[in-house]
Amino acid sequence: MINSNTVRQFRHDIYSSFPKAKDALFNTVDALMSEPQATSLPEITQSLWFERQWSSVYEGLEDGRIDQSALRAVFWQYAPRPLPGHRLWIGIDVSGIARPFSVTSADRTALTVHNLPKGTKAITYGWHFSTMVVLDEQPSSHTFILDQQRVKSDTTAIQMAVAQIKQIESHLPARSIVVLDRGYDATWLWCQCSGLNVGVLGRLKQKRCFYRPAPPPSGKRGAPCKDGTLLQIGNPATYETPDGHACRKDGKGRAVEISWWRNLHVKDARWLSLSVIQVVRPHASNTERDPRVSWLVWLGDEQEDVTEIALGYALRFGQEHGYRFDKQRLLWNEPRLRTPEQFERWSQIVAIAHNHLLLARDLVEVQLRPWESKHRRMTLQQVRSGINKLLHQLGTPARPPKPRGKSKGRSVGAIVRKATRFPVVFKKPKVPQLVPS
């Protein structure tokens, strides 16, 4: 059980991870949490916890520094731990920050826009951010962020995901599972994760092909067969008889049919043994957002209960709820900051505020509005509405501002030049060659 001393120490550890402009940055964290009605970056400075002028929020993001290694260590120190007999579920996904008209912002790449009307161009430009979180026991925004990094133009989201897994892998408890969306359907990622002490559960695309073990040599002339019969996700004629089949109930008590095939491989990595899982939900509407049939790939211990693993994939959707909370409530994509480095610092501020609210949810006394149910679990937005009283009890490690008088301003005759323009980076980086980890 988390108490006020734990949250107070968390605040001091976060403060220590700011090497420069730490007071302004920490004031920004408190202001972001305690101003639930704000709709822009300047508006959060009207919080009582932002002790500086409103322009200092931009100065802090421009001049401040955040030690990402120290911040990751703090996040992992306070991350939720699984109960005895339970697993730790880790989610990794990428989210885009659209900046189509920010020509003075560097390193913008193409982003895919979802849920658009037919005929609309589904491409915009901006930055990608890769986020690694601890998933909640049920899909909700109560995710705990472990790491959040910008995907630069010279790398890919898949490479960033592998790097994030390797950074945290040595700290993970046994039987931990990393859950990935269909965008991470990549043989290279499976090869890189095969030597790690963590299971990987990913969703598959319809075009993915697998092969069963090769038959024994026939003794005839020529090279023996390297692959067995084909299993193509989009072709039911290739399924044959699965190695196992079970009927289970999901978290809402609805029937789910699970089938699996073991000891499969892909042509690019025949040495890598994979399990393919088919999940059929008869109650689904069978639309693009709610498919009736889903296919998963499992890379990990073959002795694990496949049905439990397959049902656990639904926890991944909690990360989508977390993204929605960060963007709609914590204003993650609202500030129009010029440089990617400034927006990286803002992204870390949002991650700190998100985790702080999660740690403080059991310590906050929330005044519910008449239409809000007291029988439901408290949301992070409701925690924000009652965080002020807790912040008074915890105090702040940030030092008060020192008045310095008025600035001298620009020197006489100074020339303000036009900001540098940067083109959109369209070059797609190449994934390294497949090598066993």
PLM region spans:
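Alpha-helix boundary/capping residues
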Residues: 48, 64, 78, 313-316, ...
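Single, function-defining residue in the core of a domain
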Residues: 1-21, 25, 30, 37, ...
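A common structural microfeature
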Residues: 29, 38-41, 54, 85-91, ...
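N-terminal cationic-hydrophobic initiation segments that often serve targeting/anchoring roles
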Residues: 33, 45, 80, 169-170
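Gly/serine-rich nucleotide phosphate-binding loop at the start of the catalytic core
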Residues: 1-64, 69-70, 75
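Flexible, active-site-adjacent loop/turn segments at secondary-structure boundaries
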Residues: 55, 59, 95, 202, ...
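Active-site-proximal, Lys/Arg-enriched surface segment
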Residues: 60-139
